[in-house]
């Protein structure tokens, strides 16, 4: 039986401030650091082991992975970083407070922007400092690959080719894999693995810093999945993610 572990980064500074983060390279909070370490402790206690890791080019995911692997004495394993595992780009919403945006545009509209499959937020202009083309880490990307905004469908379309061409063959070769990434890049993979409909994906929330274990058969089809940690803590964390886009009472 194959085990694949998905880990959303620990709480970031902009998670704490309830801002749309996207491709902005913000760091972990102290709580996020502790979440990452705790994730490593849970995985070690579970007896998990890894041969190779995949993450994004954003420090909140990279640091989470490093902190978790350190708890497992696995910092020596190869780590592949790719922009294809980045969070979805939130376009002109990037940096805005989610509750204030809900007050301005309505909770329903913000929920559509945050969670719908194929409705992107308002796009950036290329002259905007938030446009990824101004960031040297993306200098090798084509203009077509640099997003002005993204919906989940766009994130799926940039992630899945990497899954099929790189990660899945690595797993099939017998390597034990962990993917440390972001809420929406991981939602993209979960949607594919569990064959979740475009409509039902709206209700899927992935909490920060909690390892999600997939048990797969030899055809890479899920047998079951489960979070490591206290079930009540997992439920509370998922509810917290769901409530981020609501207007302040």
From Swiss-Prot:
Keywords of the record: Gluconeogenesis, Glycolysis, Isomerase
Site (Transition state stabilizer): 182
Chemical reaction(s) catalysed: (2R)-2-phosphoglycerate = (2R)-3-phosphoglycerate
PROSITE patterns (alphabetical): PG_MUTASE
Protein's GO biological process: gluconeogenesis; glycolytic process
UniProt entry tagged with the keyword Phosphoprotein: no
GO-annotated molecular function: phosphoglycerate mutase activity
Catalytic residue positions: 9, 87
Pathway note: Carbohydrate degradation; glycolysis; pyruvate from D-glyceraldehyde 3-phosphate: step 3/5
Chain sites annotated for binding substrate: 8-15, 21-22, 60, 87-90, 98, 114-115, 183-184
Domain of life: Bacteria
Top-level class of the enzyme under EC nomenclature: isomerase
Any Pfam family matching the protein: His_Phos_1
InterPro entries cross-referenced by the UniProt entry: His_Pase_superF_clade-1, His_PPase_superfam, PG/BPGM_mutase_AS, Phosphogly_mut1
Keyword set includes Isomerase: yes
E.C. number(s) listed in UniProt: 5.4.2.11
Function: Catalyzes the interconversion of 2-phosphoglycerate and 3-phosphoglycerate.
Family per similarity comment: Belongs to the phosphoglycerate mutase family. BPG-dependent PGAM subfamily.
Protein's name in the database: 2,3-bisphosphoglycerate-dependent phosphoglycerate mutase
Gene that produces this protein: gpmA
